[in-house]
Amino acid sequence: MNLSSASSTEEKAVTTVLWGCELSQERRTWTFRPQLEGKQSCRLLLHTICLGEKAKEEMHRVEILPPANQEDKKMQPVTIASLQASVLPMVSMVGVQLSPPVTFQLRAGSGPVFLSGQERYEASDLTWEEEEEEEGEEEEEEEEDDEDEDADISLEEQSPVKQVKRLVPQKQASVAKKKKLEKEEEEIRASVRDKSPVKKAKATARAKKPGFKK
């Protein structure tokens, strides 16, 4: 039996869900698995283990079984509570945090025995591998950004040189064109002077002057 009740704190990004189960003669084992799905890290905080009102006057022993895929086959179950109705009907568990999956077993006694606690989910906690993957992705993004910035800087440094190189031939062409125009203007002026009637008249007068006799 799971008691579902959720609460969250924004500061720590933690969600807690009430949890409980019953061990008895009919069901001697119970495996805890997270109720919420996702990449949140989950812990089971075990609070109390107590006998039911119908429990017999006998010793009830509750233990945690080792994981089924445990490599070390020599690992033994761990007893967490020994209860008896007239002596110790309930125990409080302080600071007990378990990682799922966790299997509880009623080793001795007929029950019922009730276990209660909280499921604690921390959305901000990541596994070591996930943290490494995220750090690797961030480093790759930073390297790509640095490469882009270097490429932009190199383009900015090269572009003024290219502009200067382009301006030099343009300047030389304008100087050559100017000289050509000046030369053409001089030729035009010379041809105009040669064709002037005043200059021709002076030339003929000078040619006839030596021909007069006294």
From Swiss-Prot:
Q: Which InterPro entries match?
A: Nucleoplasmin, Nucleoplasmin_core_dom, Nucleoplasmin_core_dom_sf
Where do the coiled-coil regions begin and end? Answer: none
Q: Does the keyword Chloroplast apply?
A: no
Location of the motif Bipartite nuclear localization signal: 165-180
Task: State one Pfam family annotation.
Answer: Nucleoplasmin
Where does it live in the cell? Nucleus
Provide the function of this protein.
Answer: Core histones chaperone involved in chromatin reprogramming, specially during fertilization and early embryonic development. Probably involved in sperm DNA decondensation during fertilization.
The similarity comment for this entry is:
Belongs to the nucleoplasmin family.
Query: What name does UniProt use for this protein?
Result: Nucleoplasmin-2
What's the source species for this entry?
A: Homo sapiens
According to the entry, what is the taxonomic lineage of the organism? Eukaryota, Metazoa, Chordata, Craniata, Vertebrata
